[in-house]
Design a protein with these regions (language model features):
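Walker B catalytic acidic pair
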Residues: 125-127
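H-loop/switch region of ABC-family ATPase nucleotide-binding domains
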Residues: 153-155
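A short helix-turn-beta junction within AAA+ P-loop NTPase domains corresponding to the substrate/partner-engaging
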Residues: 163-172
Length: 172
């Protein structure tokens, strides 16, 4: 049952990242990560196989026409919500979306440090755009304190002074 196992693995990873999003104390809004389910989790493996096989058969003609698979793990979506507001991220302001993304990023970094016992290399593009001063300061402190190797690209130097003492700036 590769689709079910893949789905379960994705859910396990998302739940682990969610644990760290909830655990880490930052001024960034807590993101809530949810994966839409393709099939009811309460059905047994045999019934799942029957339903999945029938669904694949039913979609064959559509798959041929579109030249792609229209049913499967590739159709699972990650849904992100602003936890405190109980609002889908796609309906949040650009600044809130950026803050939610940073919340997810920090959660993923902390989960990765715990699971893999490694620290990732951070690549951040236009890091401080759409953030208020308090969040800029908090993010700069996180980057500095995390001791992660970090590459930040920016078109505007405003905000980068928060971390220049701890790093090196290369002008291109």
């Amino acid at each position: 049952f590769p689709t079910r196992r893949s789905s379960d693995l994705r859910l396990k990873v998302i739940n682990y990242i969610q644990k760290y999003i909830d655990m880490v104390d930052t001024p960034f809004p807590k993101a809530q990560l949810v994966i839409n389910e393709l099939f009811d989790k309460r059905i047994g493996d045999e019934e799942f196989l029957e339903i999945y096989s029938a669904s694949l058969y039913k979609n064959r003609q559509k798959d041929r026409i579109t030249k792609r698979t229209n049913l499967g793990i590739n159709k699972q979506e990650l849904i992100v919500k602003h936890k405190e507001k109980d609002q889908l991220a796609k309906f949040c302001s650009t600044g809130e979306q950026k803050a939610l993304l940073i919340s997810i990023l920090i959660g993923q970094i902390e989960a990765n440090k715990e699971i893999a016992k490694t620290t990732p290399i951070l690549l951040l593009d236009e890091l401080f755009v759409h953030l208020d001063d308090m969040r800029k300061d908090c993010l700069a402190q996180y980057v500095i304190n995390s001791k992660l190797q970090t590459f930040i690209t920016a078109t505007d130097m405003a905000g980068l002074n928060r971390i220049t003492e701890s790093g090196q700036i290369i002008y291109i």
